[in-house]
Regions:
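Conserved catalytic-core segment of nucleotide-activated headgroup transferases in glycan assembly
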Residues: 172-180, 184, 188, 318-395, ...
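A short, gly/pro- and small-residue-rich
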Residues: 247-268, 353-363, 439-450
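Basic, ligand-binding patches in group-transfer machinery
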Residues: 1-161
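Catalytic binding pocket for nucleotide-activated donors in carbohydrate/polymer assembly enzymes
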Residues: 395-400, 429-504
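Active-site and donor-binding regions of nucleotide-sugar-utilizing enzymes
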Residues: 20-23, 43-49, 55-60, 64, ...
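C-terminal alpha-helical cap of glycosyltransferases
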Residues: 506-521
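A nucleotide-sugar donor-handling region in carbohydrate enzymes
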Residues: 132-150, 266, 272-361, 387, ...
Length: 521
C-alpha cells in the first residue's frame, strides 16, 4: 500500500506555523525538513517534531518563518525515513479552510508567507512580496463576484463569452492582441459582441486600447473577476492564471479559473525550450487547444506534451498576420533579445548583477571591436529584455549612442522585429518571427550547458538551428561582421529549412484560429 502523509491541521501564531501530519501507515521518520528547490539557491531547514503511534502515525511539527529568507520561494516539507522520503499533501478539510479563512504571516519588509496546495495538493509554503491585491478590498470583490456568478451562470451560459489576454494581463502587443484586433475589426457586430480583452490599467497600451472600450476589462476589477467566472473560453498567449493576480493566496477564483477551457495561442514557436512539464496535458498548466505553426511543431506537441492531434491545430501565430520587413538600409539595427532564465526570475538586483547573464551582455555593450564595427557601418544595436526580467532593465547601461536599451512595453516587440536587419538571441522563440521575415538570426548561447541542464530543448542545438551558433563573444563579433559585410543576407543553408518549419505564410492565421474555435465550441 502506498504511504501517504496528510496535513490535517494548520495553526498560525505570530511567526510560527504549527502543523499536524498523519498517515495510516506506521512511520518512524529520521528527519523532517523544509526544503526550497530553487535551482540556483536551494536550501533546507530542519524542523523539530514529535511522533505518536496509535492506529495511525501522528506527527506534530512547526515552521518558524523567522528562520527563512525573504525572497520569492516555494518551500515543501520532506519527511525522511531510512529508505524513503515523503512530501505531505493537504487533506480536503485543510484545502477548504485555506480558501475560506486567512492563513498568512507578514514578517515585515513587504513580504508575505502563506501555506497553499501545490501540484497534487502537495503542501507548499510560499514566500513572495506583498501586492496591492492582498488586501480586504480584493477579497470582497472576489467573494461578491463568486456569489453573483453562481446566480447568473444559467442565464449567461448562452452568451459564450471569450476572454483574451497576454502575460500577466499587462500588455496588448502579442498574439492575444492581434487575435483580439482581428475579432474587433473583421467580425460582424453579432459575432464579436461577447469577446473581451483583459488589460491592466498600468499597461503602456492602455490608452491605445480605449478605442475598444466596452470590450476592455480592467484587470482585477469586479467586472473582470465576474467575467472570468462566467466565460465560456479563454484565448491567451499564456496560462490560465495570467488572467488573475499573480501567485495569489488560496481563493475561490483561482480554482474556478483552472476549470475553464482555454485556446492556447502560444507566445512563440516550440523548439528551443522544453515546456511540456508546464503546458503538457499532465503538466502544471494544461491546455484545451494548442495552436502550432507547422506539422513539425504539431509532432512535438503530440509526442512530448500528450495531446490528441485534433486538439493541436496547425494555424500559425496570430501576430504573423501583420509582419512585414520594415528594415531601413540607411540605419540598420541589430535586435538583441535574449530570453529569461528561470534561476534569475524574481531575484533581487544584487543577485542579478552578479549573474553571467548580466555580466555577459554588459561586457558585450562595452566591446570596443563591436562598437567600432557598428560605427563604421552606420548600424545600431537595440537591446530588449524579456518581460519576466523587466525589473532588471534599469541595471543595464551603455555610454555609447550606438547601443539602445529599450524597456519592456516602451515599443511593441512586433515593430522591433520588423525594423531590425538581424536578430541576436539565445533561446528565445522571437527567433521564429525574424526567420519568418527571411532575416538572419545569430544564436549567442554562452550558457548552453547550464541551460540544457535546467531547461532543455526539443531541437539539437548543434545541428538543427536555422542560424549561426556562437558560444564565445569573439565568435559573436565575427558572425556579426560577416553579416554586416554581406548586407545582412541570409545564408542559403538556412533558407532551405524554412519550408519545413512554416505551414503558412499567407497572413490568414487569425482567420484559421477563429474558424477552428467556432467549429470546436
Amino acid at each position: 500500500m502506498e504511504t501517504i502523509i496528510y496535513v490535517t491541521s494548520i495553526k498560525i501564531k505570530k511567526s510560527i506555523i504549527y502543523m499536524t501530519l498523519q498517515s495510516d501507515q506506521k512511520l518512524d521518520p529520521l528527519s523532517i525538513e523544509l526544503v526550497c528547490r530553487n535551482k540556483m539557491s536551494p536550501a533546507a531547514v530542519p524542523m523539530v517534531f514529535s511522533i505518536s503511534h496509535t492506529d495511525r502515525t501522528v506527527i506534530q511539527t512547526c515552521i518558524d518563518t523567522g528562520l527563512l529568507r525573504l525572497q520569492n520561494d516555494d518551500w515543501e516539507i520532506v519527511v525522511s525515513s531510512e529508505t524513503e522520503a515523503y512530501t505531505p499533501i493537504l487533506d480536503s478539510h485543510i484545502r477548504a479552510a485555506l480558501i475560506l479563512f486567512s492563513y498568512k504571516i507578514k514578517p515585515g519588509h513587504n513580504f508575505l508567507f502563506f501555506p497553499m496546495g501545490g501540484p497534487g495538493h502537495k503542501f507548499l509554503l510560499r514566500c513572495r512580496p506583498l501586492t496591492k491585491y492582498d488586501g480586504a478590498g480584493t477579497q470582497i470583490r472576489e467573494l461578491t463576484a463568486f456569489l453573483l456568478a453562481k446566480l447568473l451562470k444559467p442565464l449567461w451560459k448562452k452568451k459564450k463569452i471569450w476572454l483574451i489576454y497576454e502575460k500577466y494581463s499587462s500588455s496588448a502587443q502579442d498574439n492575444g492582441f492581434y487575435f483580439f484586433r482581428y475579432c474587433m475589426e473583421q467580425l460582424p457586430p453579432q459575432e464579436r459582441r461577447h469577446i473581451y480583452f483583459i488589460l491592466d490599467k498600468s499597461s503602456p497600451q492602455w490608452a491605445d486600447m480605449q478605442k475598444y472600450k466596452k470590450h476592455i476589462l480592467p484587470f482585477m476589477s469586479f467586472r473582470h473577476i465576474l467575467y472570468l467566472l462566467l466565460a465560456d473560453l479563454y484565448v491567451a498567449s499564456d496560462a490560465r492564471l495570467h488572467a488573475f493576480a499573480w501567485k495569489p493566496m488560496p481563493n475561490l477564483i483561482s480554482r474556478e479559473i483552472n476549470r475553464h477551457d482555454i485556446f492556447f495561442l502560444q507566445h512563440g514557436v516550440l523548439g528551443l525550450k522544453r515546456v511540456d512539464a508546464l503546458f503538457g496535458k499532465n503538466g502544471a498548466s494544461p491546455m484545451t487547444y494548442f495552436a502550432v505553426s507547422s506539422d513539425a511543431e504539431q509532432h512535438i506537441v503530440t509526442e512530448y506534451f500528450g495531446y490528441e492531434k485534433n486538439h493541436v491545430p496547425v494555424v500559425g501565430l496570430a501576430r504573423w498576420d501583420v509582419l512585414e520587413d520594415r528594415s531601413d538600409s540607411a540605419q540598420k539595427k541589430l535586435l538583441v533579445m535574449p530570453t529569461w532564465r528561470s534561476w534569475l526570475e524574481e531575484k533581487d538586483d544584487d543577485f542579478f548583477c552578479k549573474s553571467d547573464y548580466y555580466q555577459t551582455y554588459m561586457h558585450l555593450f562595452q566591446n570596443k571591436e563591436l562598437l567600432e564595427l557598428l560605427k563604421k557601418n552606420n548600424t545600431r544595436m537595440v537591446f530588449y529584455i524579456h518581460p519576466k526580467l523587466k525589473e532588471f532593465m534599469k541595471s543595464f547601461h551603455s555610454e555609447s549612442p550606438l547601443i539602445q536599451l529599450i524597456p519592456f512595453g516602451q515599443c511593441p516587440l512586433n515593430h522591433l522585429i520588423m525594423e531590425c536587419s538581424m536578430l541576436i538571441t539565445d533561446y528565445s522563440s522571437v527567433c521564429w518571427d525574424v526567420y519568418y521575415l527571411e532575416k538572419p538570426v545569430i544564436f549567442y548561447q554562452f550558457d548552453s550547458d547550464l541551460y540544457e541542464k535546467t531547461n532543455g530543448s526539443y531541437m539539437d542545438m548543434e545541428h538543427d538551428l536555422f542560424g549561426d551558433r556562437c558560444i564565445r563573444e569573439d565568435q559573436l563579433i565575427n558572425a556579426v561582421r560577416d553579416y554586416i559585410q554581406s548586407d545582412f543576407h541570409e545564408k542559403e543553408k538556412y533558407k532551405k529549412m524554412r519550408k519545413d518549419l512554416f505551414a503558412f505564410r499567407d497572413h490568414n492565421n487569425c482567420r484559421r484560429i477563429y474558424d477552428f474555435i467556432i467549429k470546436n465550441r
